[in-house]
Amino acid sequence: MKNAALLLILSVAAVAQNYKAEQTQDHGVSVVRLTDAASGVEVSLGPTMANSSDMKVHGKSILTNGIPFLAPWANRLGEMEFWANGKEYPFNPNLGNVRSPVPSHGLLMSSELWRITEVAADANSAHVTRKLEFWRYPDLMAQWPFAHEYEITHRLAGGVLEVKVTVTNVGADPMPISLGFHPCYRIPDVSRDEWGLHLPARTMVVTDDRLVATGEFKANSLPNPLPLKTHNLDTGFTDLERDADGKAHVWIESAGKKVEAIFGPKYAVALIFDPPAPAGQTRDMACIEPMAAITNALNLNHAGKYPNLQSVAPGATWTESFWIRAGGI
C-alpha cells in the first residue's frame, strides 16, 4: 500500500513538473520560456510580442518570424485614413508610427509597451499573459482615438500553443475590430518546394495592384492541397470550412510532417503569404494569418461593401484564440 501511494505521489509530481514557465535571458534579452517536456515543445517570447517569438518542436523551429500582433488593424488600408461609426479619421504621418502611403500592420507590430501580468505553470499548462493599455499613449490615441486595452495570453498545453487575445473597450464609442496576427511557419528539414498547403476556403478576396481589398470576392478555384512550389500568394480567403466547434484548420504538410493553424470562429479570414525567394536564395516559409476581417475592412464597411465588420461596444470585451499544432516533427 505504501509503495502504491509513493508511486501515485511521484506520478502526480512528474505531471506537475512537465510544464514550466520561466523568465530568463537569451543573448542578453529578457524572454519568457514555456516548456511542455512530454510533447517536446518549447515556446520563447520576447519583450516586444512580435518578431522575438519562437516555437520549437523537439528542438526544431516551426516559426520563421515570430507571431507579430497586427492591431488595431491587420495588413493594409486603402488610404491614409480610416472610417468608423460614420466618421473619417486621417492619420498623422509626422508621428512616425504609421506606414505610408499604404498603412499596414497597425500600430503595435514592434511595440515594447506590453506589461507582463502573469507567468505560471501547473499540471495542465504553462502560460504567460501580457497587457497593453492603448489609451495611456497619446501618439497611439492620435492615430486611433478609441480608448481600449489588449490582453494576450500564450498558453502551451498538450503540445499545442494557444494565442488568446482580449480587447476591452474602455471608451464611449463602439470600436471596430479588424485585428490579426502574422505568424510565418516552416517545416523543418524540408524545402518549401515540397510543401502542400491545405486551405479549406470557398472564397478568395479580390485586391487591387497594391494588394488592397476592393470589396469584391470570387470563388476559390485553387487546388487543395496547393503545391507551394508553383504558387506564391499574398491573398485573403474567407468562407472557411469549419468543424463542429466552429474552428477552421489550415496547414502545410510534407514528408509526414505537418504544421497546422487553427482559427477560432471570430477569425473570419485567412491571409496566405508565401512570397517568392530572391534570386539564388531559398525562402522556406509560409504565413497563415488569422484575421478578424479582410484587408481595408474599415473603409469598405463605410462604403457598404463589407457588412461583416465586427465591433466591441463601450464597456464590453472581444475575445478570440488561434492555435498552433505540429505533427511528425
Where are these regions (language model features)?
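Sec-dependent signal peptide recognition
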Residues: M1-L7
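Hydrophobic h-region of N-terminal signal peptides that target proteins for export
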Residues: L8-A16
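Beta-strand-rich N-terminal accessory domains
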Residues: Q17-G96, A244-A268, P276, A316-G327
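Extended, loop-rich substrate-binding clefts of extracytoplasmic carbohydrate-active enzymes
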Residues: N18-D26, N92-G158
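Acidic, contiguous internal or C-terminal segments within carbohydrate-active enzymes
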Residues: L34-D36, V43-T48, L132-P188
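A short, structured loop/turn motif at beta-sheet edges
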Residues: W83-E88, T117-V128, R155-V160, D189-D193, ...
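Active-site/ligand-binding surface loops and adjacent short beta/alpha elements
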Residues: P174-P176, C184-K266
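Active-site pocket scaffolds in enzymes
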Residues: V259-I329
